[in-house]
Amino acid sequence: AYRSVSYAEKTLLAGFTTVRDLGGPVNTSLKKSINKGWVVGPRIFSAGKALASTGGHADPTNGMSFELAGDPGPKQGVVNGVADSRKAVRQQYKNGADLIKITATGGVLSVAKNGENPQFSEDEILEIVKTASDYNMHVAAHAHGAEGMKRAIRAGVKSIEHGTLMDDETIELMKKFGTFYVPTISAGEFVAEKAKIDGYYPDVVQPKAAKIGPQLKNTFKKAYNAGVKIAFGTDAGVSYHGENAKEFRYMIDAGMSPMEAIFSATKTASILLGEEKN
């Protein structure tokens, strides 16, 4: 919590006056503190705790022994089945979330072997999207593998985060459904570089970081050239807070014009947030 105060100020001083936080439960409180003038930082739209399936990317008990881990459920953001999905969304709303994040596939930095497999059924995601809509919230989906992305897009999520291994079918679905793509090239570059350092990541994480990280820039090129809607995002916390602007350089290096990159962080990002009038 104390570090989040420092990170908020660094982000604001880096020139970012509004941010979307995907998966840090402490940041619903940080948001309130900023709004009350107690803390210096950007305007925050927070997803609260990211939702996961058991053993999924955002399961808070990954890597723990069963005796210590217990059996987390919707209150802890872990869902199995449609009823759990509904309850978990309502819990995040109760906790102060502005939107919902799901981890539709495995991830790079979680203590789990697979970083690509789908981790929700389409029915579960449909219920999450439907329930979020009841509370005037939308859903963002962390996803690396193509199948998990396709399920999430068909179910109606508003954005795909990372999208590392998206294929041509995924791109066409995104265009059909109007799904936003948030590439987070910064995170890919960061983990790919750190994966070269012996011992920097746990043994189960290092191969994922080395494989998935370097691919994000090429995925961005493919999506951009195909006309997918792209919104700026960094996954800061993986890369360093306050260095958000590096993403502009990566996007431009991958083929986007400077003005398009700025547009992705302003107009397009505001549309993704539903704040284009503000």
Language-model features, listed with the residues they occupy:
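Divalent-metal coordination cores built from histidine and acidic residues
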Residues: 1-137, 170-172, 177-198
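Short catalytic-loop micro-motif centered on adjacent basic/acidic residues
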Residues: 15-21, 138-141, 158-161, 233
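Distinct, well-ordered alpha-helical segments
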Residues: 30-33, 57-58, 149-155, 248
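Active-site metal-binding loops of divalent metal-dependent hydrolases
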Residues: 49, 143, 234-236
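Short acidic active-site motifs
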Residues: 88, 147-148, 169-170, 219
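His/Asp/Glu-enriched, well-ordered alpha-helical/loop segment
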Residues: 134-138, 203-204, 212-278
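Structural recognition of alpha->loop->beta junctions
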Residues: 150-170, 250-261
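Glycine-enriched alpha-helix->loop->beta-strand junction motifs that scaffold or abut catalytic
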Residues: 154-159, 175-180, 199-202, 227-229, ...
